[in-house]
């Protein structure tokens, strides 16, 4: 330890991974931050290798992906790790976010920490969308066309923004090139934001299931207790991940995307990847294009506002049955929105999507208005006596 503390860079590593004081009562739900970082590392490494053989051209993109799968040594493995790694990355991050919601990890003094996490999530969504376009299959092309066309809903300047995004008057070579460039760059932006996220975490301190402030004397060092706990989580993660890669590699890939992009043939039903589906359902639940875009934006912005619109007397859902019921209702709404996003735009799915969208926002309204009112009533009529 004396050797590590002698050098400034190693001393930073020591303060982050060895001597960092962590609450002794955190559960395995706190492992998913480390698992998300592990997934990000996998994505960056496999992405670099894939970029060596990928050709960002509408004539060659699809063929280059097939070349990677068939002729590059272990190219099939690298691609399947990258494709399935994206799904597992989102699984880890979504569990991380829902854990934060359940245990109120967004309240003082962790407002900045929470908002950095939401920023990382949004950059992840953008990066994943750009990557989904790169294979240049049928679904990739039409996903790029539909999603970028949403900017045309912006009054006055919308059409100009779409042309600027495309680099022309249609989705073409310029579009694919800039999508590839950004998809290669943004994972490093996510890595930088993650480092800042961890630095802020070490400044504000980790939360815990009881969400109570603990002194340093009541905490334990990160090593060896949580290092080995995280390693155990990574081992279990790798078992499930390897099963998906080696036995179910195509389970998340839309079969239509194995067909080269054809601008003259529109798929009967455009479905994005599963991790976009809840937001996709919110987007299309509003019949008006501009209204749908605004609603989608609000669905993400409200996550930023969460630390500032809630006023909690009790610090964690652990102590409040009302917030526990609200949380699991919200979780169910998100799962159902994902299911609705997978379905065609027709009744009854359209009506259900609109109802679930209202319930999505009702959760945040409840945290801002209804829960504080119940807390004030409880304090006044129960604890005051």
From Swiss-Prot:
InterPro entries: Cyt_b/b6_C, Cyt_b/b6_C_sf, Cyt_b/b6_N, Cytb/b6-like_sf, Cytochrome_b, Cytochrome_b_C_euk/bac, Cytochrome_b_N_euk/bac, Di-haem_cyt_TM. The keyword Phosphoprotein does not apply. One of its GO terms (cellular component) is respiratory chain complex III. The chain crosses the membrane at residues 32-52, 76-98, 113-133, 179-199, 226-246, 290-310, 322-342, 349-369. A ubiquinone binds at residue 202. Its cofactor is heme b. Its main location: mitochondrion. One of its GO terms (biological process) is mitochondrial electron transport, ubiquinol to cytochrome c. Heme b b566 binds at residues 96, 197. Binds 2 heme b groups non-covalently. It comes from the Eukaryota. It is found in: Mitochondrion inner membrane. SUPFAM superfamilies: a domain/subunit of cytochrome bc1 complex (Ubiquinol-cytochrome c reductase), Transmembrane di-heme cytochromes. Keywords: Electron transport, Heme, Iron, Membrane, Metal-binding, Mitochondrion, Mitochondrion inner membrane, Respiratory chain, Transmembrane, Transmembrane helix, Transport, Ubiquinone. Pfam families: Cytochrom_B_C, Cytochrome_B. Heme b b562 binds at residues 82, 183. It is a multi-pass membrane protein. Disulfide bonds: none annotated. One of its GO terms (molecular function) is metal ion binding. Belongs to the cytochrome b family. The main subunits of complex b-c1 are: cytochrome b, cytochrome c1 and the Rieske protein. Heme 1 (or BL or b562) is low-potential and absorbs at about 562 nm, and heme 2 (or BH or b566) is high-potential and absorbs at about 566 nm. Component of the ubiquinol-cytochrome c reductase complex (complex III or cytochrome b-c1 complex) that is part of the mitochondrial respiratory chain. The b-c1 complex mediates electron transfer from ubiquinol to cytochrome c. Contributes to the generation of a proton gradient across the mitochondrial membrane that is then used for ATP synthesis. This is Cytochrome b. It comes from Acanthamoeba castellanii.
